[in-house]
Amino acid sequence: MSGGHQLQLAALWPWLLMATLQAGFGRTGLVLAAAVESERSAEQKAIIRVIPLKMDPTGKLNLTLEGVFAGVAEITPAEGKLMQSHPLYLCNASDDDNLEPGFISIVKLESPRRAPRPCLSLASKARMAGERGASAVLFDITEDRAAAEQLQQPLGLTWPVVLIWGNDAEKLMEFVYKNQKAHVRIELKEPPAWPDYDVWILMTVVGTIFVIILASVLRIRCRPRHSRPDPLQQRTAWAISQLATRRYQASCRQARGEWPDSGSSCSSAPVCAICLEEFSEGQELRVISCLHEFHRNCVDPWLHQHRTCPLCMFNITEGDSFSQSLGPSRSYQEPGRRLHLIRQHPGHAHYHLPAAYLLGPSRSAVARPPRPGPFLPSQEPGMGPRHHRFPRAAHPRAPGEQQRLAGAQHPYAQGWGLSHLQSTSQHPAACPVPLRRARPPDSSGSGESYCTERSGYLADGPASDSSSGPCHGSSSDSVVNCTDISLQGVHGSSSTFCSSLSSDFDPLVYCSPKGDPQRVDMQPSVTSRPRSLDSVVPTGETQVSSHVHYHRHRHHHYKKRFQWHGRKPGPETGVPQSRPPIPRTQPQPEPPSPDQQVTRSNSAAPSGRLSNPQCPRALPEPAPGPVDASSICPSTSSLFNLQKSSLSARHPQRKRRGGPSEPTPGSRPQDATVHPACQIFPHYTPSVAYPWSPEAHPLICGPPGLDKRLLPETPGPCYSNSQPVWLCLTPRQPLEPHPPGEGPSEWSSDTAEGRPCPYPHCQVLSAQPGSEEELEELCEQAV
């Protein structure tokens, strides 16, 4: 028998007991109650007190007997002197005896066998005794019990008739036989307040109620715990009922479209992570709050037992503690987004976000606060909020809007040289890919497929990615060599994570359009795949490095390309051997537009000097057109000399070989103050295109060697305070101490040997003092 049936019987057995008692004792109890009630009404007990006339101080001779009043006479108390009467004495009416009235007569009845024919009835004898002066009549019916029935018929006698038998009758007769005189008093016995049968009935009722209450308490206490409703289970069931469900439709998935960068996932349907079966048409799926989908029949038992997502351990009842601990790294998982787990690459989860997230206003800087980075030299305390790099949007912008965004987002990219413009125009055409979304800034991009070119740079780091070919999806982002501190310092990030060639968020990445390499004013196409700057393969002609490597690799040696012309540093030259410390917080000028740079370089190269080197002038805005980028390289040598000095100041941990190196003239504040030549402040209008990607702006910071006195502080007639400033200092003559009032005789942008240098960042002044080792050291540090 099961436990439930046993509990039901245990609860019902008190009621069954009461029904059995009523069935067994119902009729008998009713009859007994009726008989007792009739007896109570028919027989009234009497208390007979016998007090001897002889005084007994101890009181042992006093008798208290109990009898029953007969119905033949009235029930009244009486008292008198005790006197015995024979039964035959009451048969005749003689007047011989003159008895005093007020006595109590006791009559002992004999057995009916001894007197089969009595002379008078008992009722007649009781009348006769009363007529003779008895105040009460006592009948001893010990030998004739049937006499009680004869005395029940009422005759209306006024004196009481009491029946006595048993032990009480023997005690009274013994007192009589001793001829002792006594005074007898007959009293009515009061009925008890609670008769015996009433007490038993009450005890039965009370006991039954107590048993019922005890059984109920035991049933409640002994109830199995599994039958009790668990609050946690109820909450879990409610949470599961609130989860969304849907019918899987493969056609809808194809209609929504696979994104261009998820081509690896279009060959198979999503998979249930529990049963490892693909979703088929019409299957009912359960969508958990963490946006993971499973078969409803597979995940519901798991949720009832564990209350967490099988993949990300998201708790459906208490919230996502795990996702909250990740903080901003999971901020892009908004409600309503779907995540697809692609099983073609085991161990890599591919998250595809809808385009609404990438194109919506949630990409603003307010939604995700920028992470603090190292303090760059181009920023001063109190100059306003720092601008951080934003990821590219998926939709093309107008040329003016892109230029304004680039100028607003990258105010610290003011040390950008024209060599970058030249190298941008000389890049081979980038491999075009379809329009795609940009990822959030904190996503690693593992498993993404891009069209890249084979890298021409083979680093000696432990994780150099030199095997990425066309349309190769690299997943080795987490093992890229990130040990160089300079890589982190230049980019402005304190993170130790670097992207590989397959990541479009590589800090050294920019986009080159497909087309004529001579067009420097072309807008970067949003359909072009961003490629790493170290993936340039020289084809046919000398390629200019597309970016500046700041690392410790010792395999880039540009030996014997330049010769020093001048004297080595020493005390006889009068040139100071150490430069004053340069503050890292001085403001930097913004990069000019490419067309203005080309115009300035073309106009400055034939003349060799400026007409008014002491007055800054603003260049007019030229019309965009094809310009030979190779003509820009010679005019930017002084700018990269300034960059070299800033780079050597940026890496003080590297050892210097030989004696202390001579600082470049561009880094001396006193020389720059004496020769403030060629100060050009081009107009920066939105109509001029920006030839480089905004992502590469923070790579090269402005030269910290420029003195702040060269920069305009108040608006003047030649420039506006809101316009960027470009400075170039290119002395042709050796920089030697000049007499007072005498300055350099000539300024030019040519190199020492009269030929343009294919490495702009290694161009030096024509008469720069120093040795070949120092030149190699500077070139090596620049690389």
Swiss-Prot record:
Cytoplasmic-side positions: 219-783
Subcellular location per the Swiss-Prot or TrEMBL entry: Cell membrane; Endoplasmic reticulum membrane; Nucleus envelope
Low complexity composition-biased segments: 464-477
EC number: 2.3.2.27
Main location: membrane
Compositionally biased tracts (Pro residues): 578-594
Residue ranges, Extracellular side: 24-197
Ranges annotated as biased composition (Basic residues): 385-395, 548-568
Post-translational modification: Autoubiquitinated.
Pfam families recorded: zf-RING_2, ZNRF_3_ecto
Glycan-carrying positions: 62, 92
Stretches for region Disordered: 363-406, 421-477, 514-673, 731-760
Record carries keyword Zinc: yes
GO CC term (a single one): endoplasmic reticulum membrane
Signal sequence interval, chain numbering: 1-23
Transmembrane segments annotated in the record for this chain: 198-218
One GO BP: negative regulation of Wnt signaling pathway
Tissue and organ expression note: Expressed in fetal kidney, fetal lung, in colon cancer tissues, hepatocellular carcinomas and lung adenocarcinomas. Overexpressed in colorectal cancer cell lines.
GO molecular function: frizzled binding; ubiquitin protein ligase activity; ubiquitin-protein transferase activity; zinc ion binding
Complexes and interactors: Interacts with AKAP8L, NONO and SFPQ. Interacts with FZD5. Identified in a complex composed of RNF43, LGR5 and RSPO1. Interacts with RSPO2. Interacts with LMBR1L.
Function statement: E3 ubiquitin-protein ligase that acts as a negative regulator of the Wnt signaling pathway by mediating the ubiquitination, endocytosis and subsequent degradation of Wnt receptor complex components Frizzled. Acts on both canonical and non-canonical Wnt signaling pathway. Along with RSPO2 and ZNRF3, constitutes a master switch that governs limb specification.
More details: Acts as a cytotoxic T-lymphocyte tumor antigen, suggesting that it may be used as a target for cancer immunotherapy.
Record: disease: Sessile serrated polyposis cancer syndrome: A rare disease characterized by multiple and/or large serrated polyps developing in the colon, and an increased personal and familial risk of colorectal cancer.
Protein name according to UniProt: E3 ubiquitin-protein ligase RNF43
Upper classification of the organism: Eukaryota, Metazoa, Chordata, Craniata, Vertebrata
